[in-house]
């Protein structure tokens, strides 16, 4: 079993003078995510690479699965490290690597050498050719294919010689915590968990607000949202979830406002409450799972009407995505099956038969004036009675 993993990253490498900030954040996140994995791990960075070193007694599959969910990582390479004892020893190490990893030697290959240590006495091209020749001598059944090889034999000349031929893809993106914090409006649907995942992939720490409407929505609906948060937390880390009792506000809107405007007005008050908690939590914006035209409340005019009540930016990472693309991501991050469980949330009750799709903001504000005698107290009660749940990965 491999004792060391070479961690590759992409965008971090072009960050110039601030690169160390992103590297340090990545190292910190790797240590945090590995804390519950069986085994002992040391994480260190070294000239454009991060290494995860183990004591050899660890759960390989769980370790790889955990690393493959850490934003900022583009590749996870089980690697063999060797002292530089000359070119002949390097070739011997490559032969041993192939013997160890591949039972069937009838494959095509390419040698890909990289010299991080420029004082090495051979160029990368010379290493490629010479090592390739040694591999062909040792394993005559192999063939060279520089265009589409079945096996890529990677050699990195660093303080230690790095040899690896497997690269497990990571999620990419930027390390968590390098781009501030934002508040996700999380429901039990397909879209908002995906939106949270995508914004977290850009380095944003996410908190969340969920609007609960008992007795019209059940405890199972609430648990469904908590379960979704747990799945997102596998990528984003711990999520602070605000559970808001929205029932009385919804009932007041239903009783006093035009029914074709119910959804827009409810969304506006949801945004106000979510922004309140975002301010408290020092977030820099709100996140929603809205996509243009997907439902009546997500036309351009409707989005403008909900935006109008917000002072901070509203980020919509799914805004131009097709539903099938969103579903693909939800399957990838394992939220889809939970999202389609048949428990209603507050966005699916009190829905108008014919909701307005091109709301006029002045008319909406006029309708909201009907709530003036009750809304301040209802908002205060909803905020004061909000339950906070700290959600960790499942």
UniProtKB/Swiss-Prot annotation:
Reactions this protein catalyses: [ThiI sulfur-carrier protein]-S-sulfanyl-L-cysteine + a uridine in tRNA + 2 reduced [2Fe-2S]-[ferredoxin] + ATP + H(+) = [ThiI sulfur-carrier protein]-L-cysteine + a 4-thiouridine in tRNA + 2 oxidized [2Fe-2S]-[ferredoxin] + AMP + diphosphate; [ThiS sulfur-carrier protein]-C-terminal Gly-Gly-AMP + S-sulfanyl-L-cysteinyl-[cysteine desulfurase] + AH2 = [ThiS sulfur-carrier protein]-C-terminal-Gly-aminoethanethioate + L-cysteinyl-[cysteine desulfurase] + A + AMP + 2 H(+)
PROSITE patterns, A to Z: THUMP (PS51165)
InterPro entries to which the protein is assigned, alphabetical: Rossmann-like_a/b/a_fold, ThiI_AANH, ThiI_fer, ThiI_N, THUMP_dom, THUMP_ThiI, tRNA_STrfase, tRNA_sulfurtransferase_ThiI
GO CC annotations, alphabetized: cytosol
EC supergroup of this enzyme: transferase
Keywords, in A-Z order: ATP-binding, Cytoplasm, Nucleotide-binding, RNA-binding, Thiamine biosynthesis, Transferase, tRNA-binding
Name of the gene: thiI
Keyword check for Cytoplasm: yes
GO annotation, biological process: thiamine biosynthetic process; thiamine diphosphate biosynthetic process; thiazole biosynthetic process; tRNA 4-thiouridine biosynthesis
Family under the similarity heading: Belongs to the ThiI family.
Name used for this protein in its record: Probable tRNA sulfurtransferase
CDD domains given in the database record: PPase_ThiI, THUMP_ThiI
